[in-house]
């Protein structure tokens, strides 16, 4: 299936039922302080609570994902960066992102999920190259799921 690109907000798309699953990249430090992570924390607080709780338990591992099933669908926190910080530094680990995407494929394979991702997933705050990230998404999930990239 081709990936669709559209103007809009990925969090709104999940809340409004336009997609069933929202993917985003996050760090392994228990912080959701900027970008779409902060919006998820503020608008879908139970997704943040799962992430925070797992961090407090010491069970957040890079290359793994945390899935939160809530009233509006699934938020998938793909832990693909060890840290965060200054601009123009690559924090995302492409191998770990690919590992997370493969896990998402396994979790989603039994359903006909519509997946939403933010434009520049793992590329804006995480410092990755959007074209590389998009190729990973297309290669791992693109032929199996209806995927929409939301750009504000």
Report each predicted region and the residues it spans.
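Macrodomain-like recognition of ADP-ribose-binding/processing modules
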Residues: 1-152
């Amino acid at each position: 299936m081709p990936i669709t690109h559209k103007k809009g907000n990925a969090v709104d798309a999940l809340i409004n039922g336009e997609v069933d699953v929202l993917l985003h990249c996050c760090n392994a430090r228990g912080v959701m302080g900027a970008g779409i992570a902060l919006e998820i924390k503020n608008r879908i607080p139970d997704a943040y609570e799962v992430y925070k709780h797992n961090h407090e338990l010491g069970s957040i591992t890079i290359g793994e994902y945390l899935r939160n099933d809530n009233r509006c669908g699934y938020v998938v926190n793909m832990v693909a960066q060890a840290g965060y910080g200054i601009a123009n530094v690559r924090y995302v680990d492409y191998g770990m992102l690919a590992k997370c995407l493969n896990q998402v494929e396994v979790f989603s394979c039994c359903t006909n999920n519509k997946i939403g991702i933010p434009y520049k997933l793992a590329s804006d705050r995480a410092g990755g190259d959007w074209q590389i990230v998009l190729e990973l998404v297309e290669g791992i999930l693109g032929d199996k799921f209806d995927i929409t990239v939301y750009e504000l």
